[in-house]
From Swiss-Prot:
Gene3D superfamilies to which the protein is assigned, alphabetical: 3.30.230.10, Histidine kinase-like ATPase, C-terminal domain (3.30.565.10), MutL, C-terminal domain, regulatory subdomain (3.30.1370.100)
Family: Belongs to the DNA mismatch repair MutL/HexB family.
Domain of life of the organism encoding this protein: Bacteria
Biased composition (Low complexity): 388-397
Gene: mutL
UniProt GO MF annotations: ATP binding; ATP hydrolysis activity; ATP-dependent DNA damage sensor activity; mismatched DNA binding
Gene Ontology biological-process annotations: mismatch repair
Comp. bias (Polar residues): 343-352
Official protein name in the record: DNA mismatch repair protein MutL
Length: 637
């Protein structure tokens, strides 16, 4: 048989085999087009599970008359113009196949009007001849797409459709997914003339929690942990099922990359690993949204765009893992700190911030009520002090209603933040006792990490951790002076001491889940052989295969670094000279600043440092002119 170019209709129907799987996939493509057009409201109407009619109406920018016919042709799109655009794509669609594929297997009507046009225009296309007719029509600014009699010209495909109820279930599930990602959009869904879903815009946190309850269930919304974490160009937000409520496998598992719902094994592994020490074998529910530089992720790897490929997958995995571990750890600490207070006040009841899905509970007034929320930027391993605020994570947990009678208002936000940061054990000391100097307290403080730093505490009872202000400083009272001690500065000193204590015996390298490959230079093999002892002491395992440097193991202090850049720089450094142990320790401490740590761990580590180092750090604290403030206050009176 001779090679011939396929007719347009046949080519479009073949492409439709990947794009148009069932009515839900048609709705997915059309709604994503509406969102790319800047719509703030999308109305979906279907009949007989979508097999008879699919109608999508939006208030987006619309399509000019001159582009209507072109919009129904293959590989025609306004989303990109060059390869550079593809490598930094942020829109849902970019291949220009959806409308052409849908029109090849249905009777399609596209009506649209732009703000610049005085009237709307309507394009008709059927799958038989692919001919497009354009006629004037009445329509507001925006677009409406109707797909009638899906698969009318491909009977084999139509026979594989399930029942109307099953097809509707798939449509409803997809709408839930997009409703979680786009809280700013008003979505409605009608089936056979009846409105079954109405997701109003969720512009406030309480409104989004209400949408979360509608989509994921009341139990998930009541007990989930709020995730907010940012580090360099990575940002993670969303909700995670709490360990106390996780049981078995949850179907509420949604992961979004730059607003696009994807399936990724890395995030599933990170979530299970974060839960391992609290609930082993559990696959909890989550709604997580990862935002990163579009150049660092490839979305053009799956026909239906369900998968992505990260350029630094290990970096992304560890970022998600440590963000989740930090939030879970903070929730556990807050629960422990809150429990004694409730026991000491049997006649008091804390009003819940979340509960059943009712209008009063999720009203906007909840925004004005204090909630158990505090900034835990100190939970990250600190970098330079000027960069310290760039990495942040926050946790918010709903308070469960008490069985006791009587309500009291929650304490102020600042009080909750200071109390939530305290990791000391139960103590009857007053607030002023908590900010006294280490020489004036002997209450025990526990290390959240179980003192895994390799440092021995200088005494068996460390001082109670003082209050934390702005998530970045401890408030110290010493010799009638009030001063602020930088948590980031102390964390760097603790990290350096930890590395120094371990480096003399050699660091233990941790295997990478996915080894990193880098194009090799000619002299790297000689460097690896000559500096083998140093690399082994660093816990770094490298190999060269097929012209590539394979990074297999690194110490924990380098896990969050961009290894493809860092390791070549290390090889160049040790090629020129054999660095001293002190220089290597300093270098590792600088790289390890990307790790996350908590104020409690930093305080425990501070008390484990030698006395002379502690004094040096305390001397670097910044005094506050409280005496001058008092004089000015008294003079004003």
């Amino acid at each position: 048989m001779a090679i011939e170019k396929l007719p347009p209709q046949l080519a479009n129907q073949i492409a439709a085999g990947e794009v148009v799987e069932r009515p839900a996939s048609v709705i997915k493509e059309l709604v994503e087009n509406s969102l790319d057009a800047g719509a703030t409201r999308v109305d979906i109407e279907i009949e007989k599970g979508g097999s008879k009619l699919i109608r999508i109406r939006d208030n987006g920018s619309g399509i000019p008359k001159a582009d209507l016919c072109l919009a129904l042709s293959r590989h025609a799109t306004s989303k990109l113009k060059s390869l550079d655009d593809l490598e930094a794509i942020l829109s849902f669609g970019f291949r220009g196949e959806a409308l052409a594929s849908i029109s090849s297997v249905s009777r399609l009507i596209l009506t649209s009007r732009t703000a610049e046009q005085a009237e709307a225009w309507q394009a008709h296309a059927e799958g038989t001849e692919m001919a497009v007719k354009v006629l004037p029509a009445a329509h507001p600014v925006g677009s409406t797409v109707e797909a009638v009699d899906l698969f009318f010209n491909t009977p084999a495909r139509r026979r594989f459709l399930k029942s109307d109820k099953t097809e509707f279930t798939h449509i409803d599930e997809w709408l839930k997914r997009i409703a979680l990602a786009r809280r700013d959009i008003h979505f409605t869904l009608k089936h056979n003339g009846k409105t079954v879903r109405n997701y109003r815009p969720a512009n406030t946190e309480s409104q989004y929690i209400q949408r979360l309850a509608l989509v994921c269930g009341k139990a998930f919304a009541e007990t989930c942990l709020r995730i907010e974490c940012q580090h360099n160009d990575l940002s993670l937000s969303g909700y995670l099922q709490s360990p106390s409520s996780a049981n078995g496998y949850s179907e509420t598992q949604y992961f979004y990359v730059n607003g696009r719902l994807v399936k990724d094994r890395l995030v599933n592994h990170a979530v299970r690993q974060a839960f391992a020490q609290y609930a082993e074998g559990v696959s909890p529910g989550y709604v997580l949204m990862l935002d990163l530089d579009p150049h660092q992720v490839d979305v053009n790897v799956h026909p239906a765009k369900h998968e992505v490929r990260f350029h630094q997958s290990r970096y992304v995995h560890d970022f998600i893992l440590q963000a989740l571990q930090s939030a879970i750890s903070q929730s556990m600490e807050l629960a422990l700190n809150n429990e004694p207070e409730i026991q000491q006040s049997p006649d008091r009841q804390v009003s819940p911030t979340r509960g059943a899905v009712t209008a009063p509970l999720y009203s906007e007034s909840i925004e004005r009520k204090p909630s158990v929320s505090y900034d835990v930027r100190d939970s990250h391993s600190v970098t330079n002090q000027r960069d310290y605020s760039s990495g942040s994570s926050s946790y918010r947990s709903p308070l469960k209603p008490s069985a006791r009678n009587g309500d009291v208002s929650l304490p102020s936000q600042s009080s909750i933040r200071a109390y939530g940061e305290l990791l000391s054990t139960q103590s009857s000391s007053t607030h002023s006792d908590r900010v006294l100097s280490t020489q004036q307290n002997n209450y025990a403080v526990r290390s959240p990490a179980g003192n895994q730093n390799g440092l021995a505490a200088s005494n068996s009872h460390a001082a109670s951790m003082p209050a934390v202000i702005a998530g970045e400083f401890w408030v110290l009272v010493r010799d009638d002076k009030i001063s602020l001690l930088s948590i980031s500065m102390v964390a760097r000193a603790v990290l350096k001491a930890e590395i120094a204590a371990k480096f003399s015996q050699g660091l233990v390298g941790q295997p990478l889940l996915m080894p990193v490959a880098v194009a090799v230079d000619d002299d790297w093999l000689a460097i690896i052989e000559n500096r083998e002892q140093l690399l082994r002491k660093l816990g770094i395992e490298l190999s060269i295969r097929l012209g590539q440097l394979i990074i297999k193991k690194v110490p924990p202090y380098l896990r969050n670094s961009q290894l493809a850049v860092l390791i070549p720089e290390l090889l160049q450094w040790i090629q020129l000279e054999l660095p001293s142990d002190a220089a290597v320790v300093k270098w590792l401490a600088e790289q390890g600043a990307n790790r996350f740590t908590s104020a409690g761990e930093a305080w425990f580590g501070l008390n484990a440092l030698p006395d002379d180092v502690q004094r040096e750090l305390y001397n670097l604290s910044q005094d506050l002119p409280w005496e001058q403030w008092m004089k000015e206050n008294q003079s004003d009176r």
